[in-house]
Amino acid sequence: FSEFDMDDSGYQDSPTILFGQNDVFNNMAGYNFSSVRFRVRGYSSESQDVYLAGVRMNDAITGYTPYSLWSGLNEATRSKESVNGAEVSDFGFGGYNGLTNIMPMASSVRTGWRGSVLTNSALYRLRLMLTYASGQLDNGWSYAFSASARLGGNDWIKGVFYRSFGYYGAVEKRFGEEHKLGFTFMAAPGERGAQNGSTQEVYDLMGDNMYNSNWGYYNGKVRNARVRKTHEPIAILKYDFTPESQKLSASATVLYRFGKNGYTALDWYDAPDPRPDYYRNLPSYFYMDNTDYNRRNFAKYAWAKEAWETDLPSTTHINWDRLYAVNSLNSTASGNRSKYVIEERRVDQNDLNFAVNAKWNPVKFLTVNGGLSYKWNRTEYYKILDDLLGGDYYVNIDQFAERDFAAYPTMIQNDLDYYLRNGAAQTLAQGDKYGYDYYAHVRRAEAWASGRFTFGGFEATVAGRLGYSKFWREGLLRKGLFPGLDDNGNPFTYNGEIITKYDQIDGRPITSKGESDKKDFLTGSGKINLGYFISGGHRIYADAAYITEAPTFNQAFISPRTRNTVMPDLKTIKTLTADINYAYSNSGYDVRVTGFYTSIKDRTDVMSFYDDSQNSFTNFAMSGIDERHVGVELGFKVPTPVPNLSLQGVFTYGQYIYTSNPTMYQTYDNSAEYVAGTYGVVIPYWKSHPVHKKNDDG
């Protein structure tokens, strides 16, 4: 529960805008099943590609699609094209879990005025939307604008609120019959209070599974400590070439994403954990019905139990008054030093994209599509001091490093260079950066092409893609735990003792400042789609693909907030997938039946957590994760005698399993030393693993 933006096991909410295609299964899976966190074919969310004006929008760092960038702009982003599974599209090679291209240009928005008011959403109490599009005027110009507001929260989770807005503006000019140039600018700024997961003990004590530990009363009002704040505008410049012959058409798009994305959280130093559901604040900390338990204090247990069961605000929620009081009483010569503050963890992207796509029809039975794309991304990760909570200043030191290295003042510094220049740790005012600050750099280039052949009712498509990816970390601060070498190439020392740490495997100094090794990957992929249209709306088709992809930045660095260490033995991810389908669409009836098989090899996963067995915060990295996804899908829509009313249903059955036991690397976060005695030999066995189990020799 330490990260507000945690992966959540590969699940990500998918808005209905992505599933407005003529496919019953995907429509229901994307909308009706989103509340139960359904994953199509068991795939993780980054496997779904989403394009904006021909530019792939999947996040350069995580691979996920940033749906929130256009959230609330439904009318402006309604026009789109989609394909399922491993099908090949006219606007991109895609992956193995479908591809959607949203067209947010002025001429793509439906002509006229549109407005709406909604009051029954699970996320907010009120939504207002207004959109206007001129359509193409006689002078060749088109323009459109849209605005929205979504306000309120919900009534069943206390402390949660939602304030989100959206704005969109686009102009487009047609020059003659062959050329068109358009510009679009849009964003969805907003903020929302978050809910936090807790433990079953807390839910039982409160009698409420919707309990939220993130809030408390301050000056008589509800205040949430964890608030997501975003404003990331997107600017798009798109050129289209459509000659009268229609044998050759092309488009070129430049897209730039920028702005800020952050969320707040409590931070503290030399003070008790302020979270109400921290384990030391619960009854079970004082007494458990266990003969081996060594903290038996029934009186404190009874007091804590009563406080929780009666919902005593100072116990069950953040006690803001106490935090302010502690800060105001911590007087020093420089003023009141805050022990509790609000931090904002920022992830600010600069993402520049260029894409060219072309379509060629040399003969009636052949269509050739292809394209080139390039992505330049620099994302800055850092923290800023958002609120001193009544104090005058905060100090930029690492309290977790201080626990292990209190005798080494240089090693507890978050900014060692500042300490060496000034002889003291940096004092912080509101708005200052602190803790960590680094760039994630990503460069990605891609070329793809496809050929579609049609003969009567038979259709065949073959496609290929070549890609190149490179990423690296650039630390902007020198952390005392991992100083690396000084400007003269010498190790750092304290009182004659070397404090520079060296990698246990390759012997190189571990650094936090400057550029890491640059990891690059060359990938190649191929697809084939075969289909046959039978009379009367019947169709059978099959898809197959072999896809290689580079790992993402966030699955490559073991602890990017502290150091430049890259996960050992990084490999491309290899996916082999195939499906066979029957579809029927006629007279209001729609049916699709699919059988699918997917094998994924060499995934990686990186996580950090406090390991009780080691009594330390650790980094846990796994490589060589293999998966298999096998199953069937059925979707149907049947008209009823009542006009505009149909019966819809879906069914799926699948087996999604791990087919390998990965290699694990576990390191102490404060020292980068390996927990396991030998590098890379510890293999965690999946619980109830259906394929690989330990033999008698282990």
Residue ranges with predicted function:
Residues S198, V202, I412-T427, K470, ...:
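Surface-exposed extracellular loop regions of Gram-negative outer-membrane beta-barrel proteins
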Residues K221-A265, S334-K383, L428-E459, E515-S525, ...:
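Outer-membrane beta-barrel transmembrane strands
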Residues T119-G152, W156-Q195, V227-S245:
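Transmembrane beta-barrel wall of Gram-negative outer-membrane proteins
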Residues F1-R39, S44-E46, V50-V88, R150:
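Periplasmic N-terminal accessory/gating domains of Gram-negative outer-membrane beta-barrel systems
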Residues K180-I236, G262-E343, A406-D432, V606-F609:
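Acidic/polar loop-and-plug regions of large Gram-negative outer-membrane beta-barrel proteins
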Residues V341, T367-S535, Q648, P684-Y685:
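Signature of Gram-negative outer-membrane beta-barrel scaffolds
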Residues F596-K601, T618-G698:
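Gram-negative outer-membrane beta-barrel transporters
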Residues W70-S116, R127-M129:
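A beta-strand signature from Gram-negative outer-membrane beta-barrel systems
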